[in-house]
Structure formats: structure tokens, C-alpha cells
């Protein structure tokens, strides 16, 4: 076919002039890179071609190329590339959450960075690091927008991220303009998500839109609202995500659960005095109080405590009846005020724990502050209790650090982990942070509280406001004492009631205050410190906790992610008001990490263990930093402690060295806390954000070429690619030990299921077979009744071991066994020959040979076989006859009687010839004849018997009296013990008795 074409198009420079000067018909040229354009525009060509315009200008940047794809028909829209330097608009396959949308950056949904790309949504920042050789996404990094604590722009093209959960990262861009553009968008989101809670809910949070291409984050709100709206819509359409439970699966009222479980109805009651949050705005709607306290008493006593947080009962020891209470500091003031109603509430609660007739135990008041701090608060109408006003009271000061000291130590440990100095200074740097020391003090005081309760002392715990250190101490003590709170369901109720319902300021503790929104910074990782303390207990005693390490990590991440509504408010009151204004609902995290999710259930949990935890070493030397949370999820623990010069640097890295260069552009002023620390600790120093001093191109060879494969693998993620992102949109934590245990348990459960199905199939077939086959036609021989044929030497060895003195009294060896029978010889019970259960099968008495059932042959007698005592089955009739001691025969008469009986029995068996060396082939219908050992089987000389009497060799004629079982299995002679009568209960093993038939060997007197 001939194609009319125009002049050839030049698609690249080269020697020999322009390709357009050549003719299309010139097929002899080796350079076939030119592609002709057809003159007929409606003609469909079979190859791709490129139309280059503005080529004559001589500038590559101004030239444009139009790519016409395979089988192109003229008139189709072309693919145009203006410049080879222009970034392509492609999207990495990352599954978005319900309600999640990508925000365009410079009209691109995926923005290029050094070593990969990133994209931003209304929930998170996703960084994709790729392999340049294979263009494969090797690693994904996820940063929830609400988790960002600080975002800084650094010269030449860096963005530093500090996260509230403790991680720090540096993103490297190709140009400074790209870094500034992304920083502007992220900083707007940072401002929007750190507004005071009072200014957030003036409009509907669901109104976020990404249509504003200049800055799509100008109307951003917490993603939890958009996520909940999308999930509710999917639920109505029947398309709820499989990893989420329905909303009604989470109990709304949890106070009654503990009240009923602990049996508190006798002395306590649930009060609804705070139903509308009028008494205390930070307390839950329902509170447990003593029965002797009325609602009016609570209203009168609440103002005496700071913010109205009066003493409330939160737990009771079922063993000692001791009560655990919580409150805020009393309003004592300089004049030492007192309140009789407050004293009455405490007295009634303590009275319920005292047992009449026993010695009264002391009432312990644990003030989480130090004495100096508590005394200084008296100037602000605060203070501590006067023990003279409370019966048998004792006051203890715990000296735990306040939120500012906790925040300072957390910042120090975060900086230390991501900006390590020489390895020899590691322990010194860690000690300087004070983080592990604070953690140890918290665990020690919680253990002391648990010890008081276990000894029967009722305890009241409070600090200044009663929602930070108070919550930490009380919840840790409850975990140490009550096994229920160490389960997934119990730990969920503990968080929901003691932390969320009792008003821990979860939102304010993660809020970054800046600008004109307030001078006081209340952010502090109090909840994160509590989770790390629980992690230490779990690491010390892993079998006592039903939830896994991954469960705690997921809680820590979503406490700051903004995905779930569980941690977005300071109290129940704020959540209720926000939901009323927004007319929406929120998804709780418990719909995701409940006990229904096997990933968060410990496979080695000991569910039978009850009571308090075993003694735990809580000293500083036994603690370690929670690296899985504070550092990168996919870094191995060894990377943090490796030399800096051996660490690979990529497009998104952890800062490696500290720099004081002025190139760092701070987007917010450095933090400086100069307020008085009443606990006596030092001022909190301002934090300088670390930077990277070199660009990625300068460090491409930072990993030595001689590094082994094992060393290089330390820097690789455990899970490569998009599989590292979990269903909730954050990086998955891989617990290899739990994964292995889950696999083993699944295989075990599958094996049990298959065996159950097999048993059920056998039962079904047995029922069908019973209905089809008559009892007279059924013939079955148990495998236990079949024995392999032994040699003559072994038989003769058994014969030589016969000791007539030790034979059983009144024992009648049988030569004929009853054949197959459909019922028991005594109780006439029908047998099921296909049943796998011993109770439904037939058995033979090893004395008389009758066919009996399990119920009629529960007794056993003992014999000696090969020097070992073996239990044999006996029917009830034979067993009773064995107890007739008056019929006991002498050893000689027993031997004679046994021999004569054998001769008489053998003479009556069809086909048996005592004078012949051959086996008779006459087989009756109901009996199988005995088999006589032929003379050729004794080719080897018969060994001398190992008898004490040193008998001579057995004569040749003896072989005629060595008989075998009617079922063609050779019978061994039994040597019986002197004490043969032994009864075993029904639970003993009957398998041995089933498999060992009595082998009768009788010696003919010569």
C-alpha cells in the first residue's frame, strides 16, 4: 500500500544536516528516526509520530513537541509537552480515605521533590521516595496535618517538620521557589488547625473545599468532620468500610459498666446531678457517689474544689473494699478554709470501705504536686487539705513535674533522638533530657497508690486542676490492680471514662498557641507519657495485656492525627456543643481498634490470670525511649545510634546535625517559657530547629560502597511500597512476633476445624450405614486387634519367662474369642462400628474373650509383658471372680490346669491337628482356626531360655502347643504380676487394652 506523505519531520539534531532535507522514500539510510506525516488527515496510521514546532528558533526551551499516539486519526486531541523541564501531572496510586481530597499545588496533584514527590490532602502530607533506576516507589512517609507542631522554611530549599508525636523530618525540594510555594500552603493549614476551640465551631467544619487553587487550605478544618460525614453517607448506602464498625457498636454510657462489674450498688449510687454540666463543666454527666450523699450535698460541696471538680469515686477494690477517688485541689487559701459538705462526701466514701469489727485503715490523700508548689497555690486560693478535718487521714506529696516541665523534657528527648552527637555522649544526653526520670517517678507513685489500695486504704488523688497528673496516677494504678483494664475492652473504657469523660484537656494539650490567641502555652504530651508508661508495663509482662504494642502506637498516633473525634475536645460538654452547632456526628477510634480487629489482640495473652500485675522494675535503668513512636516508623532502632556519616540522605530525611546558621527562616517565634516553675525546676530553654547543612546531591555517596548487604538492609523499610500505608491512612507498624503467633493460631484453628468436619462426616456416614446394613451382616475388625507376627525365638523367650507363682488367681486363658457382634454380651447395647468414640465401639474381655461395651468393662488388671506392667481390660464378671481369694490355686496346679484346659480347647477347634506340623485349612464360618508354627520357621537354633531354673532347650514337639489368635495374629504369652488386681477409673487410657490381645502359650508336660 502506498502512502502519500509530506516532508519528513526532524525530531532531533545530528550530523549530516537536518532530517527534513531527506526524502521519505529514502529507506536506505540507517537512521530511521524520522517519521512521515500523512497528507490525508482522515487516514489512520499505525505508528506514533511527533510534530515539532518553533524548531527553527534554535532554542530547545522554546520549542514545543506534539506527540500523536498509536493509531492516531487526525482531529484527535494531541498530547503537548511545552518543555522537558516542566513537571508531569501524574498520581501515585494511594487509596484515599472517605472524604479525603487532594489539594492542587501549582495545578499539580503530585508535586516533585528531590528523590520523589509529595501530595497534600485535607488530612495529611504523603511523601513518595522512589528508586531512580527502576522508578519504583520504595518508601512512603505520612504526616497528618493536625500532627504538625512546627513548620520552618530553610535556605536553600528545605522545609523542616516537627510533629507533636515526637518525630522530625526535612523535605528537600529542587528549587527555593518550590519550597516556598509548598511552605505557604502547609503553613496556612497549620494556622487553621491550631485555632482555639472557642473560635472553631462558628461555622460548619464540613465546608472545606480544594477548589481554591491559590491556597486550598484557607477554609480547612479538622478532617474528622469531613471523614465522619463521608462515612455516614457510605453507611446509609450499605458501603461502610470493612475496617470500621457501625456507630451503635460503641456503648454510649460506660459508667454503669464499672458500677455493675465492681458490685458497688450496696454502698454507692450513680448521680445525674451533672446532667447539664451545671455543677462541673469538665465532669461527665453521670458520677458515682456514696449513697448517703444527695444532689444538694454535691451542689454545696463542689465550689470548695477548683473548677467544681468535687471528689468522685472511680474504682473499688473487690478484695479489700478500698475506694479510689479523684478531685482537684481544695480552695483553702491563706486562711485555711474548710467545707463540711466536702468532708462529708469523703467520709461517706471511706466509711463504705470499712468492714465492721476490723481495725479502721488510714485514709490516704495523695497530692501529685510537690510541697512547695502546693503551698504556693494557697496565694491563689488553692492549697492542700488539713488532715485534722478528715478522720484518720494522711497526706502524701508526690512531687510529679507539671505540664511545662514535661513539655521541656519531651522537646529535649526529641531533639536528642534526631540530632545525635558522638555515641559516647548518648547516655549523658539522654539523662539530661529528664524524660525517663519523669517516667520512672510516675510509675513509682502509681505503684504506691496501688499498694495502698491493695492493703485496704482508701485513696484520694488530686493535683492542681485534677486532669493531668491525677489522671495519670489513677489510671496506672487501676491497670496495675484490675485485670479487666488490661483487656482491649477494659482499656477502651478506661480511656473513655477517666481521660475523656473526666475532662483531660486533650485538645489544649496538643494545641500550638501563637500570635494573638494567647500568651500561655498549655501543650504538653501528658497522654503520650501515660501511653509510654503502659508500654513499659506491657513490655515487662506481655502475657498480662490483651492489647498489643501496635494498639498503643495506633492510639498515640491518632491522639494527634485529627482523624477520629475521640481526641478533639477537652470535655464531654465541648463535644456535645460542637455536635449541636455543626449538626453532625464524629467517628470514634474504638470502631477501628476494638477487640474485633485481631491485629490489636495479643496472641500470647493469658486470659486466666487475675489480680494485680507481678512486681515490675520501674527504675530508670530498666526504662527505654519509645523509639517506635518518637522516631520514624520505618527506621530500625540501630539507625538512630549509627554514625552520622554512614546514614543515607534522601529527599525526605531526619535532620542529622544541628546548625546555628541564620539561613533558617522561622515561621513562628521560638518558644521561651520564662514563667515561674513552682515545682522548683529550671526554666524551659528555647528550641532551635535543626537543619540539614548540605543538599542531597552532596551526600549521594554518604553510604560507603563497602557496606555489606546486611548493613544496607538496616536502612530499608520493613514493608516496601504502598502496602506500608494502613487502612486508616498512616504508616503501619509491623509486629513480626504477633504476626507469627497469629499465623500459628490460625493454622491450629484450621486443623481443628478440619478434624471436626471429618468427625461429623464419619457420624453422618455411620448413621447412613446403620440404616442400610442389618446387624447380622456387619463385620468389622479393629486395628487394635491386629498384631504383627513375631518370630519363634521371641515366643520361646516369652515362654521361658513364665513364672507359675506369679500367675493370676482364677485366670482362665482363652483360645477362642467371640466373633463380630452387634451388641454387648451383658447389657445388649448396640455398637456403632464407624464411631470414633470409645464408648460406641465393641471391646473384648482379655480374660473370657466375650464382646462387651465400655460400660461393662471399665476395670483393668495388671500383667507383666517384656518386663513392663501393662493394664488389660476385664469385664465386670471376670473382674469380680478375680477377687475370690478363697479360690486361689497354687502355682503348680494353676500351670497344670491351664495346660489341660488348653489341650481340651485346642481339641475342639476345627482344623487344628496336634500331631501335625502343618496348618489346617479348614475354616468355619464363625471362627478362624489357629495357626501352628511350621518347622521351617525354626531354622535357627532355639536360644536357651533366660530362666532362673536353667531349663534345657524346648523340645521340638513344643511347637505344636504354641497357638496363635483366631484373627491370624500371633499371641504372646502373658506373665502376670503378683498383685494383678488393679482398678482404674473410666478416664484412664483404654487404647493400650484395645491393642493388646491375650496371647495364650501353654506348655505340654513332657
Curated annotation (Swiss-Prot):
Active site, per annotation: 463
Class of enzymatic activity (EC top level): hydrolase
Zn-finger region bounds: FYVE-type: 818-883
Organism: Caenorhabditis elegans
Impact reported for residue 463 to S: Abolished phosphatase activity towards phosphatidylinositol 3-phosphate (PI3P) phosphatidylinositol 3,5-bisphosphate (PI35P)
Positions bound to a 1,2-diacyl-sn-glycero-3-phospho-(1D-myo-inositol-3,5-bisphosphate): 377, 402-403, 464-469, 505, 509
SMART domains: FYVE (SM00064), PTPc_motif (SM00404)
Residues at which Zn(2+) 2 binds: 845, 848, 875, 878
InterPro entries (alphabetical): Myotubularin (IPR030564), Myotubularin-like_Pase_dom (IPR010569), Prot-tyrosine_phosphatase-like (IPR029021), Tyr_Pase_AS (IPR016130), Tyr_Pase_cat (IPR003595), Znf_FYVE (IPR000306), Znf_FYVE-rel (IPR017455), Znf_FYVE_PHD (IPR011011)
Name of this protein: Phosphatidylinositol-3,5-bisphosphate 3-phosphatase MTMR3
Gene expressing this chain: mtm-3
Binding-site residues, Zn(2+) 1: 824, 827, 853, 856
Location of this chain's protein in the cell: Cytoplasm; Membrane
Domain notes: Interacts with phosphatidylinositol 3-phosphate (PI3P) via the FYVE-type domain.
GO terms for cellular component: cytoplasm; membrane
Single GO BP term: phosphatidylinositol dephosphorylation
PANTHER family assigned to the protein according to its UniProt record, in alphabetical order: MYOTUBULARIN-RELATED, MYOTUBULARIN-RELATED PROTEIN 3
Composition bias, Low complexity: 1-10, 890-901, 913-926
Primary localisation category: cytoplasm
Activity regulation remarks: Inhibited by sodium vanadate and peroxide.
Amino acid at each position: 500500500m502506498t502512502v502519500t506523505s509530506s516532508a519528513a519531520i526532524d525530531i532531533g539534531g545530528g550530523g549530516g544536516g537536518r532530517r527534513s532535507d531527506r526524502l521519505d522514500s529514502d529507506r536506505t539510510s540507517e537512521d530511521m528516526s524520522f517519521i512521515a506525516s500523512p497528507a490525508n488527515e482522515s487516514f489512520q496510521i499505525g505508528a506514533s509520530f511527533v510534530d515539532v514546532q518553533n524548531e527553527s528558533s534554535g532554542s530547545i526551551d522554546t520549542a514545543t513537541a506534539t506527540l500523536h499516539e498509536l493509531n492516531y486519526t487526525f482531529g484527535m486531541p494531541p498530547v503537548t509537552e511545552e518543555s522537558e523541564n516542566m513537571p508531569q501531572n501524574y498520581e501515585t496510586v494511594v487509596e484515599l480515605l472517605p472524604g479525603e481530597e487532594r489539594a492542587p499545588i501549582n495545578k499539580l496533584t503530585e508535586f516533585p521533590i528531590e528523590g520523589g514527590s509529595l501530595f497534600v490532602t485535607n488530612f495529611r502530607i504523603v511523601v513518595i521516595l522512589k528508586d531512580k533506576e527502576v522508578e519504583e516507589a520504595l518508601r512512603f512517609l505520612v504526616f497528618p496535618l493536625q500532627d504538625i507542631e512546627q513548620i520552618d522554611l530553610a535556605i536553600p530549599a528545605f522545609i523542616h517538620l516537627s510533629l507533636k508525636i515526637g518525630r522530625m523530618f526535612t523535605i528537600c525540594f529542587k528549587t527555593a521557589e518550590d519550597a516556598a510555594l509548598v511552605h505557604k500552603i502547609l503553613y496556612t493549614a497549620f494556622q487553621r488547625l491550631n485555632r482555639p476551640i472557642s473560635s472553631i465551631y462558628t461555622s460548619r467544619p464540613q465546608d472545606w473545599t480544594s477548589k481554591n487553587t491559590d491556597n486550598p487550605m484557607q477554609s480547612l478544618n479538622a478532617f474528622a468532620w469531613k471523614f465522619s460525614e463521608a462515612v455516614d453517607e457510605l453507611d446509609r448506602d450499605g458501603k461502610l468500610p470493612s475496617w470500621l464498625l457501625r456507630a451503635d457498636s460503641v456503648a454510649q454510657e460506660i459508667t454503669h459498666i464499672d458500677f455493675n462489674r465492681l458490685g458497688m450498688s450496696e454502698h454507692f449510687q450513680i448521680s445525674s446531678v451533672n446532667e447539664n454540666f451545671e455543677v462541673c463543666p469538665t465532669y461527665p454527666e453521670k458520677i458515682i457517689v456514696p449513697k448517703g450523699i444527695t444532689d444538694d450535698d454535691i451542689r454545696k460541696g463542689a465550689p470548695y474544689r477548683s473548677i467544681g471538680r468535687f471528689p468522685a469515686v472511680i474504682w473499688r477494690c473487690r478484695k479489700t473494699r478500698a475506694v479510689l477517688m479523684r478531685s482537684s485541689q481544695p480552695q483553702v487559701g491563706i486562711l485555711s478554709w474548710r467545707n463540711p459538705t466536702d468532708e462529708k462526701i469523703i467520709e461517706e466514701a471511706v466509711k463504705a470501705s470499712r468492714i465492721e469489727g476490723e481495725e479502721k485503715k488510714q485514709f490516704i490523700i495523695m497530692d501529685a504536686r510537690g510541697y512547695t508548689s502546693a503551698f504556693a497555690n494557697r496565694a491563689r486560693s488553692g492549697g492542700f487539705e488539713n488532715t485534722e478535718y478528715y478522720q484518720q487521714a494522711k497526706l502524701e506529696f508526690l512531687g510529679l513535674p507539671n505540664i511545662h516541665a514535661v513539655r521541656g523534657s519531651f522537646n529535649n528527648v526529641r531533639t536528642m533522638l534526631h540530632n545525635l552527637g558522638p555515641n559516647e555522649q548518648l547516655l549523658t544526653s539522654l539523662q539530661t533530657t529528664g524524660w525517663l526520670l519523669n517516667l520512672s517517678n510516675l510509675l513509682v507513685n502509681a505503684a504506691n497508690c496501688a499498694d495502698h489500695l491493695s492493703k485496704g486504704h482508701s485513696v484520694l488523688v488530686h493535683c492542681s486542676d485534677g486532669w493531668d497528673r491525677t489522671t495519670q496516677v489513677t489510671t496506672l494504678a487501676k491497670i496495675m490492680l484490675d485485670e479487666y483494664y488490661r483487656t482491649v475492652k477494659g482499656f477502651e473504657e478506661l480511656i473513655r471514662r477517666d481521660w475523656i469523660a473526666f475532662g483531660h484537656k486533650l485538645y489544649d494539650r496538643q494545641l500550638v498557641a501563637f500570635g494573638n490567641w494567647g500568651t500561655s502555652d498549655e501543650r504538653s504530651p501528658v497522654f503520650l507519657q501515660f501511653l509510654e508508661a503502659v508500654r513499659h508495663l506491657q513490655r515487662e509482662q506481655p502475657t498480662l495485656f490483651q492489647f498489643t504494642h501496635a494498639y498503643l502506637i495506633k492510639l498515640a498516633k491518632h491522639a494527634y492525627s485529627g482523624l477520629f473525634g475521640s481526641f478533639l475536645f477537652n470535655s464531654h460538654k465541648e463535644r456535645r456543643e460542637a455536635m449541636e452547632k455543626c449538626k453532625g456526628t464524629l467517628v470514634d477510634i474504638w470502631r477501628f481498634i476494638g477487640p474485633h480487629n485481631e491485629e490489636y489482640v495479643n496472641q500470647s495473652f493469658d486470659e486466666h490470670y487475675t489480680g494485680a500485675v507481678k512486681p515490675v522494675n520501674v527504675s530508670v535503668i530498666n526504662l527505654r525511649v519509645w523509639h517506635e513512636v518518637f522516631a520514624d516508623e520505618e527506621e530500625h532502632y540501630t539507625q538512630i545510634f549509627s554514625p552520622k556519616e554512614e546514614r543515607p540522605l534522601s529527599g525526605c530525611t531526619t535532620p542529622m546535625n544541628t546548625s546555628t546558621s541564620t539561613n533558617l527562616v522561622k515561621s513562628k517565634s521560638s518558644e521561651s517559657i520564662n514563667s515561674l516553675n513552682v515545682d522548683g525546676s529550671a526554666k524551659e530553654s528555647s528550641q532551635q530547629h535543626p537543619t540539614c547543612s548540605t543538599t542531597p546531591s552532596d551526600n549521594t555517596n554518604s553510604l560507603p560502597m563497602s557496606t555489606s548487604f546486611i548493613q544496607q538492609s538496616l536502612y530499608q523499610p520493613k514493608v516496601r511500597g504502598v502496602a506500608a500505608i494502613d487502612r486508616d491512612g498512616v504508616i503501619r507498624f509491623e509486629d513480626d512476633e504477633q504476626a507469627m503467633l497469629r499465623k500459628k493460631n490460625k493454622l491450629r484453628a484450621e486443623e481443628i476445624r478440619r478434624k471436626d468436619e471429618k468427625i461429623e462426616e464419619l457420624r453422618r456416614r455411620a448413621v447412613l450405614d446403620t440404616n442400610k446394613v442389618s446387624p447380622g451382616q456387619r463385620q468389622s475388625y479393629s486395628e487394635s486387634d491386629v498384631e504383627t507376627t513375631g518370630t519363634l525365638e521371641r515366643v520361646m523367650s516369652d515362654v521361658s519367662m513364665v513364672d507359675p507363682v506369679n500367675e493370676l488367681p482364677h485366670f482362665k486363658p482363652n483360645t477362642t474369642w467371640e466373633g463380630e457382634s452387634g451388641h454387648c454380651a451383658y447389657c445388649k447395647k448396640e455398637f456403632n462400628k464407624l464411631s470414633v468414640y470409645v464408648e460406641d465401639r465393641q471391646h473384648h474381655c482379655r480374660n473370657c474373650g466375650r464382646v462387651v461395651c465400655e460400660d461393662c468393662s471399665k476395670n483393668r488388671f495388671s500383667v507383666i509383658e517384656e518386663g513392663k506392667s501393662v493394664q488389660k481390660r476385664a469385664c465386670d464378671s471376670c473382674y469380680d471372680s478375680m477377687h475370690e481369694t478363697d479360690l486361689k490355686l497354687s502355682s503348680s496346679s494353676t500351670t497344670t490346669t491351664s495346660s489341660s484346659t488348653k489341650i481340651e480347647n485346642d481339641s475342639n477347634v476345627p482344623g487344628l491337628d496336634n500331631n501335625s506340623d502343618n496348618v489346617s485349612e479348614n475354616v468355619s464360618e464363625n471362627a478362624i482356626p489357629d495357626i501352628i508354627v511350621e518347622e521351617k520357621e525354626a531354622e535357627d537354633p532355639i536360644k536357651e531360655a533366660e530362666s532362673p531354673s536353667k531349663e534345657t532347650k524346648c523340645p521340638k514337639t513344643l511347637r505344636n502347643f504354641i497357638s496363635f489368635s483366631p484373627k491370624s495374629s500371633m499371641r504372646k504369652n502373658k506373665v502376670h504380676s503378683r498383685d494383678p488386681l488393679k482398678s482404674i477409673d473410666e478416664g484412664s487410657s483404654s487404647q493400650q487394652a484395645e491393642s493388646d490381645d491375650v496371647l495364650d502359650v501353654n506348655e505340654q508336660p513332657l
